[in-house]
Structure formats: structure tokens, C-alpha cells
Amino acid sequence: MRLLHLDSSILTDTSVSRQLTAQVVQDLHAAIDDLHATYRDLAAVPIAHLSGAIAAGFRPLPQPASDAALVAEHALSEQLVDEFLASDIVVIGAPMYNFSVPTQLKAWIDRIAQPGRTFRYTANGPEGLAGGKQLIVASSRGGMYTQGPMASLDFQEAYLTATFGFLGVRDVHFVRAENQSRGPEPAAAALISAQASIADVVRSVGRGVGRGVARARVE
């Protein structure tokens, strides 16, 4: 069983999303035997944003790239897709920045969203090719976006649900800590609530992974 763990917060010791992903991963290891993890810190070791030259490597080139830096970028793109496709569980730390996700996380998504690898176009419309995974997103936000007047400004969780759904990932679980910029008491209460929700999420993921393994054996 393979786990892909990504953090994207630009903060370190004070990062709420990093605290949550660490607890999620710890609980997953305790709940699932023989779980092998791959970790990427997308803020500490950022991935270059997509360019025309990098995107050209998503499909066969008339002739191989000769520039060493570009060759390395094409190889990285393949490595990122391979890591994602090989994973059974993906854990992503995704704080809300300016109503959306960190640019570091967007750079990773732009590398793995590749036609022919993680999705394809058919006569019946687009089809995701990365199904069967369990995705856990540790979401931290300064205000309240699940309800109320700020809900229409949520381009973070909505974006992640839509994007991974397009790639075929339907089992998306959120561990959510809101109100992190509303003062110490609301922030602490929201963090405690988020931490308390992790056990249920891990149990749900464990059941989902079991169903996925059973389907794979039948197929």
C-alpha cells in the first residue's frame, strides 16, 4: 500500500495544515499495515511552474530536448505523475491563500494533470484515469467558508474537489480548520475540532482502500 504525502504551506512550525497532515499520516500508519510513504514539501522544494517547453514534454517530442535543465524538468514531470498514479492514498496539506490554493500546490497539480496519463478525452466526454484513490485534504482557512457570506469565495476546496474529480478521484475527505485568523479562541477551537475529525476520516479511508484492493483482485 502506497501513500503520497504533500505539504504546501509556506509556514513551518506555525502551519496548521502541516500539523494536520502529520497527524493524519501518523494515524494512517497506525491503522494500515505495510504502508509505504513518499513525502514532498512543495514549499521547501518548489516545483517550477508550467511553461510551454515543460508542457511539451507531456507528449512525444519530434526530437528529445537537448537542454539539460529542460530534460530534468521533463523527467520530474514523469516522476510526479508516476508517484501520484502509484499511490493508494494521497494526503495534501492545502491552506487557503487568497481564496484558493498555494501556488506551490498548483504547480504540482499542473504537472500531474496530463492527458493520456491521468485523464483522457473520449466520444462521451473527459474520463479520469486516476480513480480508486483515497484523497485526504488538510484544509486550513482564516475565516469561515463552509457557510455564511464567505462561502461563495471558496475557490480552494471547491477547486480541489473538481480537479481531482476530473482525474477520477471521487473519494475526497476534508480535515478542515477554519477561523484561524479570527483570534486565539476561535482558532484553537477549530483546530481541536479538525484534529478530532481525523479518526473518522482515517477509518473511512481504511474501508475505502480495502474496497479498492478487493476490486483490483477481482479485476
Please identify what each model-predicted range represents.
Residues 147-219:
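Glycine-rich phosphate/pyrophosphate-binding loop and the adjoining helix
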Residues 94-95, 139:
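Glycine-rich, N-terminal phosphate-binding loop of Rossmann-like dinucleotide-binding domains
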Residues 121-166:
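Short, glycine-/small-residue-rich phosphate/pyrophosphate-handling segment
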Residues 1-94, 101-103, 107-110, 114, ...:
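N-terminal beta1-alpha1-beta2 submodule of the flavodoxin-like/Rossmannoid cofactor-binding fold
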Residues 87-88, 132, 169:
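Short, well-ordered alpha-helix to beta-strand connector turns
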Residues 8, 140, 177:
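Cofactor-binding loop segments of dinucleotide-utilizing enzymes, especially the Rossmann-like FAD-
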Residues 115-120, 170-171:
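Short, structured loop/turn "capping" segments at alpha-beta junctions
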Residues 4, 38-40, 136-138, 173-175:
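Hydrophobic/aromatic beta-strand patches that form the interior of the parallel beta-sheet core
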